[in-house]
């Protein structure tokens, strides 16, 4: 089987763990390594790729800055350390990417931001705008306010959620190990690297060892969980050794890693979810011109809406019907029912006047819209 090549992916999420970013002995950033990684990111960026970074390290950096003793931290201590570390982490990424003329935008999220639909849409829109502006979003779990999430390995799963949210076609988990082995390689010298996983089966899950370092809360188990999230959403994933300099270039050169493949693509998987998994909360009836536009792949604008029915919140699924009441499709609406009713039939510039805020130009963005049927639904 021929494996994918890095050059063929257009939108990439790179997850960097604490054990890679921070020198455990000195408690400081591995500056030379990070500069090399930033150069790799800049190379992808120059080639026209959209690149996002999910970076751990805020608690570890905060511990160092505050000179806290080694050992476990209580919840409130972890949160306070994260508050200090987040400032340092943002500055570090801004500097290393800025050296290549790339702007960095910090986004702090929790799992709730990726699962509650209104917050999900806000975060997704922010990421999309940063990418449109050719900035690199640097995303970290908001450990200052998170509770149960401040625990071992969540940034692996968070990275998968971010990749799904951003419709990325590749998630790279940089680790302190080459990939998934048939057994934990430290304990078993006969363990073999698995170069490709086409489906996360029970057998694959059983191979997940407990590779963990003092600074990292991650392990192979959470990486397998991340793979399930990513591949279900149409995102390929790979695990590669990040301890070497220029780890992304090593992947591009065919270096050792484990690929987790998916037969779907992010847009198809997302639309399958919208079409088959969400209960519509209302209905938008649109005019004939809007029907033609939607079938041509356009977004639904307020001007094309002639009637709003139901009680729905921003981010809810709604049905879209033509003037003859025939169902055209369904999608995630960018306004609640009250505001949608106010701006129906109006041009996008009128939204600011009517609502007092600029709002979204689309009632439903085309990426959040399913017209007709989706394969597999």
From Swiss-Prot:
GO molecular function, one term: ATP binding
Binding site for ATP: 15, 175-176
Enzyme class: transferase
InterPro entries assigned to the protein according to its UniProt record, in alphabetical order: AceGlu_kinase-like_sf, Asp/Glu/Uridylate_kinase, G5K_ProB, Glu/AcGlu_kinase, Glu_5kinase, Glu_5kinase/COase_Synthase, Glutamate_5-kinase_CS, PUA
Pfam families xrefs: AA_kinase, PUA
Keyword tRNA-binding: no
E.C. designation(s): 2.7.2.11
Protein known as: Glutamate 5-kinase
């Amino acid at each position: 089987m021929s494996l994918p090549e890095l050059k063929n992916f257009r939108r990439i999420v790179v997850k960097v763990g604490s054990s890679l970013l921070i020198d455990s002995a000195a408690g400081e950033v591995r500056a030379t390594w990070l500069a090399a990684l930033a150069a790799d990111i800049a190379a992808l960026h120059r080639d026209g790729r959209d690149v996002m970074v999910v970076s751990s390290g805020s608690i570890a950096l905060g511990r160092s800055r505050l000179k806290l003793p080694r050992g476990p931290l209580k919840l409130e201590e972890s949160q306070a350390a994260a508050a200090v570390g987040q400032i340092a982490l943002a500055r570090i990424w801004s500097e290393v990417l800025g050296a290549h003329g790339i702007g960095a935008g910090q986004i702090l999220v929790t799992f709730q931001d990726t699962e509650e639909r209104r917050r999900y849409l806000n975060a997704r829109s922010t990421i999309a705008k940063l990418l449109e502006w050719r900035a690199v979003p640097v995303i970290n779990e908001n450990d200052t306010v998170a509770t149960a999430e401040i625990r071992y390995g969540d940034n692996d799963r968070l990275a998968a959620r971010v990749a799904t949210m951003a419709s990325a076609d590749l998630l790279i988990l940089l680790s302190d190990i080459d990939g998934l082995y048939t057994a934990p390689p430290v304990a078993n010298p006969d363990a073999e690297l698995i170069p490709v996983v086409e489906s996360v089966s029970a057998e694959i899950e059983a191979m997940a060892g407990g590779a963990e370092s003092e600074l990292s809360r991650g392990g192979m188990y959470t990486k397998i969980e991340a793979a399930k999230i990513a591949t279900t959403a149409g995102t390929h994933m790979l695990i590669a050794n990040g301890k070497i300099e220029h780890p992304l270039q090593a992947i591009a050169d065919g270096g050792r890693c484990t690929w987790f493949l998916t037969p779907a693509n992010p847009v198809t998987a997302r639309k399958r979810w919208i079409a088959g998994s969400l209960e519509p909360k209302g209905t938008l009836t649109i005019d004939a011109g809007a029907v033609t536009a939607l079938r041509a792949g356009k977004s639904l604008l307020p001007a094309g809406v002639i009637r709003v029915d139901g009680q729905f919140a921003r981010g809810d699924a709604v049905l879209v019907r033509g003037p003859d009441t025939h169902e055209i499709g369904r999608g995630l609406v960018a306004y609640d029912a009250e505001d949608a009713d106010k701006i129906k039939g109006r041009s996008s510039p009128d939204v600011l006047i009517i609502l007092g805020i600029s709002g979204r130009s689309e009632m439903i963005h085309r990426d959040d819209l399913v017209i007709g049927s989706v394969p597999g639904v």
